């Protein structure tokens, strides 16, 4: 994978194909090739390669993780087709899932519940902006908080989270079986997955059912784990609209709150600047998403917007585009869609808010929406257009907009998406006003009310626990 990390896309692809032809590490090579292809938007070939890899090594959980991860981004598969693959994952390695809890205390009516969080992102990552506020605001008079953390690089976020825990277990080198034993020994009541199928996850521990109650919270992965061993999927009515609950292996628990997460901005973000279009003389659309979300449907839709808004530009900025070869691949894709290179600014800059200051209107991706960068758009005064697509990964953008009271930027078709983007760009005076109002609106919204959100979350944990006790009685 080193060539891929260095931006040598063609060389990496050739290396993987040669390894496959020589029958060298064939399954892992096919899985790596698949991920590389999906990153370039070649989903049909990529998914076919990874399915072949699974046929060669059906018990390889890492390949299964990559397979399910890539499926979420496919622009052509239906939600039902994708969920079928998740159900197949549930049948893997189903042994050792018999409940085996130690010291489940049911005699006392009121006691501290022990909550355990399993995550590999308890450091300065995009997901930590949602996770850190939970740890900071937990009521430790009512709950004991434990972190089961895989953190290669400890930083100030790690220290902050750790300081609000009653217990911290480093799980880097622990097997799922050993971790399950540790969780049982500590008497954890409710175990929370914060990673889903992202790299380095510890989903395997949940197959052992080491705690009486378990749930997966959408912020780390965005969709079902596929594991029936996990009791609940924590979301809300926007992410999982009525009638779509059957697309989740877990029972969907919709939080009784305007949104199912809370966001703490990076303290270094800085202030909101004036609308760039006022000095540029043209509208700049933009995204900070990874390349895997930029499928042909998205590119066609964005190209139609650029064609309809005279002299407009598009910024595409993320770590996938730090090297020239990936830039050229997507410049060519837009060229085929009728957009010349001089209207594109593709690259990578950090921190993200410096790029966001150059953007007038954000464009969300579909069928898998963007995540943290959408909230950062809003915090920097940038409205964005999103397409409400399949649950729940395709409704993240809608979730944030509903939380701050701007559902008018949610589209329900690609045609409506184009129309909304064009309408928003047509009135610079209104767009400038929106830019200055968005941060105060967001700060006053449920998305920024940390204490209130965590209070509702804790009430949810207590309700889940009461349901367990009722079943056990």
For the regions a protein language model found, what residue spans apply to each?
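Alpha-helical solenoid repeat scaffolds of the TPR/TPR-like class and their adjacent stem/linker regions
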Residues: 1-282, 300, 328, 332-339, ...
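Short acidic/histidine- and often glycine-rich active-site loop of Leloir-type glycosyltransferases
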Residues: 394-405
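Substrate-binding clefts and catalytic carboxylate motifs of secreted carbohydrate-active enzymes
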Residues: 286-297
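Glycosyltransferase donor-sugar binding loop
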Residues: 149-153, 313-328
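Short alpha-helix at the nucleotide-sugar/activated-sugar donor binding site of glycosyltransferases
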Residues: 377-379, 402
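Conserved acidic donor-binding loop of glycosyltransferase catalytic domains
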Residues: 387-388, 393
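Hinge/capping helix and adjacent helix->loop/strand transition within the periplasmic-binding protein
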Residues: 301-308
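Short hydrophobic "strand-cap" motifs at the C-terminus of beta-strands
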Residues: 118, 288-290, 317, 347
């Amino acid at each position: 994978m080193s060539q891929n990390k260095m931006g040598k896309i063609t060389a990496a692809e050739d290396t993987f194909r040669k390894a496959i032809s020589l029958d060298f590490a064939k399954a892992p090579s096919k899985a790596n090739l698949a991920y590389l292809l999906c990153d370039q938007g070649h989903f049909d070939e990529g998914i076919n390669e990874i399915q072949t890899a699974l046929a060669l090594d059906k018990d390889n959980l890492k390949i299964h993780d990559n397979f399910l991860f890539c499926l979420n981004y496919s622009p052509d598969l239906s939600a039902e087709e994708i969920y079928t693959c998740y159900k197949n994952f549930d049948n893997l390695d189903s042994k050792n899932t018999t409940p085996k809890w130690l010291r489940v205390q049911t005699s006392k009516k009121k006691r501290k519940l022990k909550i355990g969080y399993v995550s590999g992102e308890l450091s300065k990552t995009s997901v930590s902006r949602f996770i850190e506020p939970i740890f900071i605001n937990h009521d430790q008079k009512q709950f004991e908080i434990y972190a089961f953390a895989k953190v290669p690089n400890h930083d100030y976020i790690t220290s902050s989270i750790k300081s609000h825990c009653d217990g911290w277990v480093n799980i880097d080198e622990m097997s799922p079986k050993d971790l399950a034993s540790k969780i049982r020994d500590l008497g954890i009541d409710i175990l929370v997955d914060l990673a889903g199928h992202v790299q380095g996850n510890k989903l395997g521990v949940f197959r052992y059912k080491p705690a009486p109650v378990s749930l997966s919270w959408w912020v780390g992965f965005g969709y079902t784990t596929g594991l029936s061993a996990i009791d609940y999927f924590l979301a809300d009515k926007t992410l999982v609209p009525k009638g779509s609950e059957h697309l989740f292996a877990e029972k969907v628990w919709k939080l009784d709150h305007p949104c199912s997460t809370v966001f703490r901005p990076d303290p270094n973000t800085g202030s909101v600047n004036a609308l760039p279009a006022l000095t540029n003389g043209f509208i700049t659309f933009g995204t900070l998403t990874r390349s895997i979300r930029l499928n042909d449907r998205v590119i066609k839709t964005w190209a139609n917007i650029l064609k309809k808004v005279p002299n407009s530009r598009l910024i595409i900025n993320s770590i996938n585009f730090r090297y020239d070869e990936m830039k050229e691949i997507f410049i060519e894709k837009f060229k085929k869609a009728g957009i010349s290179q001089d209207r594109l600014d593709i690259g990578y800059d950090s921190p993200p808010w410096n790029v966001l200051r150059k953007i007038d209107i954000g464009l969300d991706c579909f069928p898998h929406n963007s995540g943290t960068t959408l909230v950062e758009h809003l915090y920097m005064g940038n409205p964005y257009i999103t397409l409400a697509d399949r649950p729940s990964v395709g409704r993240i953008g809608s979730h944030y907009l509903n939380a701050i009271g701007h559902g008018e930027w949610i589209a329900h078709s690609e045609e409506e998406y184009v129309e909304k983007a064009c309408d928003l760009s047509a009135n610079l005076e209104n767009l400038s006003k929106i830019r200055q109002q968005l941060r105060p609106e967001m700060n006053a919204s449920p998305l920024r009310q940390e204490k209130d959100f965590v209070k509702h979350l804790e009430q949810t944990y207590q309700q889940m626990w009461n349901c367990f006790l009722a079943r056990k009685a």
